[in-house]
Regions:
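Solvent-exposed soluble domains appended to multi-pass membrane proteins
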Residues: 1-136
Length: 136
């Protein structure tokens, strides 16, 4: 209700309520780059690290570089997700956009694996082991 009031339109239970824009400016960029794929706030850090030329282990960062060639994907806590070609609303069990059964089933498995990995990271204190291994 608050989101609807602030946005000036009714969203109900729609993933559209999460849409936003991101602008990154750098004086060293020769020309503007426009990215038209879905991304999330967790994708900002790896994107900035890439733009700054910083070395990092991408396996240890949850987000993905927005400027990479990888397809866009945004996951939500209820296992809903948005790809560059379709949206899946887990609460309603609805799909908006065209997707084959094979692609949808594969993405469902991928999303389930991501949530399993996230749960395991949390339950085992994975990053404390990484910090110990790296001597930090």
């Amino acid at each position: 209700e608050v989101v609807d009031e602030l946005a000036g339109q009714e969203f109900g239970y729609s993933l559209d309520a999460y849409r936003s824009r991101l602008v990154i400016w750098s004086g060293s960029m020769e020309k503007p780059v426009r990215v038209n794929k879905v991304c999330s706030s967790i994708d900002i850090l790896p994107t900035l690290l890439n733009l700054m030329g910083a070395e990092y282990d991408s396996r240890l960062i949850i987000g993905r570089d927005i400027l990479s060639d990888s397809a866009g994907l945004v996951l939500f806590p209820d296992r809903s997700y948005v790809t560059d070609t379709y949206e899946y609303n887990a609460a309603l069990g609805t799909i908006v956009g065209d997707v084959s059964d094979e692609t949808f089933d594969a993405m469902q498995l991928y999303v389930a694996d991501k949530f399993t990995a996230a749960d395991n990271i949390t339950e085992t204190g994975y990053y404390s082991y990484v910090a110990e291994y790296l001597g930090k």
